[in-house]
Amino acid sequence: SYYELLRDHISNFTEESLQYLSQEAGFSLLESRVINRDTIEFVLQKEAKENLSIFRYSGQKIDISPLLENEKEIQEDIEAHIAKLKEKGERIAIWGASHQGLTLLSTTALKEVVSYIIDSAPFKQGLYSPASHVLIVPPEHFQEEPVDEILIVAPGYTDEIAGIIKRDFQPCPRILALRGERITEL
């Protein structure tokens, strides 16, 4: 998804470009895998220059048009969802002051309607999100300022967070998650 291409990170890599960079820095690749659908994990070992293999990428340049299409689809889905919220006079919060959530807030119309960001990490609470300037609050804040729905934007923790909301939030708001390029109700 486009929201994984982080504007606040200095570099984003493909497996091939990261392998090339690692070898240029004097490391050999022992193991490579993709975790959480989009994070490249490498196990590297420092090598003497003469022991390094030469990496040559023979593939094609990367076509980013699917990434751009994904961004467009997410933008359109979010705008349609916001229109329905406004029509009903309802309020939304998001759960997750993560890179995905902060990217979505800073690049979509969500920043105009989100009441607050819930995050259970104490070091984030009381701060404001970059670019969108939305307050980050602890989960207990919901009891002081209930919203009609919560959009979970912490993909690795969606089920866990949904369970917390169902267990602890009364009245229970609608629980949503961004799956692919669509907002879905859980």
Indicate residue ranges for each PLM-predicted region.
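Short, glycine-/aromatic-enriched active-site segment of Class I SAM-dependent methyltransferases
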Residues: 1-11, 15-17
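Extracellular glycan-modifying ectodomains
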Residues: 4-5, 20-23, 44, 183-186
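Aromatic-acidic/polar surface patches that form glycan- and anion
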Residues: 11, 33, 71
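Structured core elements
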Residues: 12, 29-31, 43, 93-94
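Conserved short secondary-structure elements within globular domains
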Residues: 12-29
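Conserved S-adenosyl-L-methionine
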Residues: 27-37
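Short hydrophobic/aromatic beta-strand or adjacent loop that forms the aromatic wall/cage
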Residues: 38-42
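Hydrophobic, well-ordered beta-alpha structural blocks that scaffold small-molecule cofactor pockets
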Residues: 43-186
